[in-house]
Amino acid sequence: MCQFLGVAQEKGILRGRALEKGTKEPLPNAAVTIVGTFYQTLTDFDGNFEIKDIKPGTYSVKFQFIGYQPILFNDIRITSKKPVNLTAELQEQSEMLNAVTVVGRKNQVDLEKASSAITLTGNEIGKLVAKGVEDVLAQQAGVQRTTDGLQIRGARVYETEYLIDGISAQDPLAGTGGGVSVSSSSVGSLNLMTGGASAEYGGGSAGIINTRIKEGGEKFSWGLNYQTDQIVDATSFNTDELEVTLSTPVPFTKKKLRLFTTARGQWTDHYFGSTATQLKSSLFPDQPEFWAPRQSNDYTHTVKLSYANKTVGKFTLTNSHSLKVNQNSRTLQIVGFDALLTPGFQYDRSNNLDNATTYTHHSNLTVLGWNKRINAKTGLTISAGRLFTNLRADANGRPFRAETVDQIYDEAYIFTGDLTVFNPNDPYGNYYLIPGNGLINNGGVTPIWHDHYAAENTFKGKLTFQPNAIHTISGGLEHALTEYQWVDVYRPWVGAPIVLNDSTTTPSVSIGSSNDIWKVSPQKGGLFAQDRIEYKGVKATLGMRFNYWAPGKFADNAVADSTSPVLPAIRDAYNQNSFNAGGLSWKVRLLPRLNVSFPVTENNVLYFNYGHSMRMPHPRFMYAGLDPQYQDRSFLSSLGNPNLNPEVNISYEVGYKTLVGSRIGWTINAFNNNRFDYIVSRRVITTDATGRPVTKTMYINQDYAKIIGVETQLNARLNNSFTSFFNGSYQQARGKSNSARESALQIAQTGEVPLTQEQFLAWDRPWKFN
């Protein structure tokens, strides 16, 4: 027994040297860490090191030296039989700090992160069955894909922050959570953070999706991919896909300037059966057969230039462009506000799709980035971007409305085909007509006409300072100048002139039966600071973010104008809760962040994170109907609330990560997300431009939700060419209401909202496995 214990307690030894790559000079005081353990030491004056009493196993060893790029050696096997020698040659950094060079295969789980985050490289994405970024994300734990979009950990689709090369690529007005689309082949890396995001990120209360576009390689390469389902007609949805990629160094630049570009088109008629004769977009009126040959038409194009030089650092220029033309009603939605959760196919118009709502979503993002290591301890990253996105919904390319109305357009008031008389023997003569199967096929047109655009100019800067091997301090700022225009008209032909005879025409009296029209220029931004501490295996990040925003002159003028319909209580609260600077009214909020991880045993890490995050309310609920000269007089029209606050999430998470050898990684975590200040609708009484009292729908911060859940993921590398993963999750999403409109409906039906009762929310998906 004593002899057995003596053998079991034998330990291994790791020794080696840290050198400068170019000169082979030793690097004294370089930090050497065995990841996922408490083992850590510094090199001596000659660059040598030795770590004793290591439990036998397979580890990752990390070398760090201030001013040099860290190196991570994976699959280092420590045994008790003989010491393991390891020499690391570190290269001086010319770009951003903390970029790590990995030697060996990528670990199946990252033991250094105290968060729920996954990073996929372009090669890993290429092995998945995925055509776009959303397809890749839908396969991850905690992510649900529904008809509305991607929902992360029980949150609503619009709560996720979607970035391309660090700049927002999200349409802030569409309500879908998406915006600029990119193909999976253009992705260099995809980082999904569902919990524990750092203070650098401040725009998403559910999660962060950061896509890095590929850069051109050292050699010329190109690719062509074409797919179709029309080989066998019996199973065809009339789908075609074409994608072209190109990667090359630019001639005469000594391979310092590189180009990557990809273009992709996807055309399909889907599986619904019914299709329009020809989709038409009023944004692209010429050649509709080219832009919309099928029922759904998606185009993406991405190009990236990169230039690296040791003296000036690294510059990148990215442009991503996407266009969608389809009849999917989920293209425009305010889910979680007042839209119903329904599929996107317009079933009631399936016999009349030539007059159904056609959506055109056109987006363009340009990002200029620069990063440079200023000295051995300091690095700087700067990026500037412009996002422009435009969404149009109309009656399959028809103009807004004709100059005069000479026919009935309302689908509900045109009856054709077989009609059945209901209640024909009623003694009072009350007869009802049942219009066949109820599907619209009568020459009427959709009552929806919508157009919005968003232009965002964003600047970001981040400074990183590493005074020693223990602390890495970073701070920065972000500021966005925005311009939003919203035009939403229902039944646009209502109020148009009517020709009475050859000489008499009625005047135009309204823009549709109801409308919502505004143009605003709000601003938003944030400051952040954080300190990442690494000491003997323990890693902690302490961060704080200071977010600020200004609703803009439009809201300020509406509050200051006594003739505007802003309620007195809202006007007083707006003035009390904001401060003036630069001619605008501003609001602020502090968002603390904390991440901690520490090893329990070798290659077994426990982590915890806590954080506050926020999401700005949809602009529609802040600005609708505030212009005193232009107001919607329809019943229960919307009235903006400029004093709305952001929706807030306070999250807690605890998790456990383990590496079993070098081939298997396992993670399990539990989270608790408490969401506050969700927006709900209420009916209020105010006065219109004529002074008469009117009832309007206004929105306030009052709702909440609570989401709890457990997630697990298992990654395995079976051999050099075959890898596999499994993930599963269980969660509960509970709250008072599914949408902003639901609470108002409860008041209308019962006279109250049960404040103490919760229900499972409509988007709650308890179980998911991949």
Name each model feature, range by range.
Residues 69, 75-85, 99-198, 208, ...:
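Periplasmic N-terminal accessory/gating domains of Gram-negative outer-membrane beta-barrel systems
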Residues 381-385, 605-607, 611, 621, ...:
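Membrane-embedded beta-barrel scaffold of Gram-negative outer-membrane proteins
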Residues 104, 224-228, 261-267, 317-323, ...:
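Transmembrane beta-barrel strands of outer-membrane/channel proteins
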Residues 549, 671-674, 686, 692-770:
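Gram-negative outer-membrane beta-barrel transporters
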Residues 6-99, 103:
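Periplasm-facing N-terminal accessory domains of Gram-negative outer-membrane beta-barrel systems
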